[in-house]
A protein has these predicted regions:
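Long, contiguous binding/interaction regions
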Residues: 1-75
Length: 75
């Protein structure tokens, strides 16, 4: 995971579009459950997930909680 102080970002790679979209849908479910939504950059076999809290223009505990939940999807 990388952070620049304003964003928590991780790139995930998958062996095809279907697996990528299954991951994206799981991320969406987590985001809706938490009421906290990441920026997603999706392409064939990859997805970059970026968390930030716009209200504080930076990171909060919720960003780290959501990122950890998404990490559990692939570990």
């Amino acid at each position: 995971m990388s952070t620049d102080g304003k964003w928590l970002s991780r790139r995930f790679e998958f062996p095809g579009f279907g697996r990528t979209m299954a991951f994206v849908n799981a991320v969406a479910w987590i985001a809706e459950s938490e009421g906290h939504h990441p920026d997603l950059d999706v392409g064939y076999g990859r997805c970059v997930v970026q968390w930030s809290t716009h209200a504080v223009d930076g990171l909060t505990e919720n960003d780290f909680i959501c990122a950890a939940k998404v990490d559990c999807l692939v570990e």
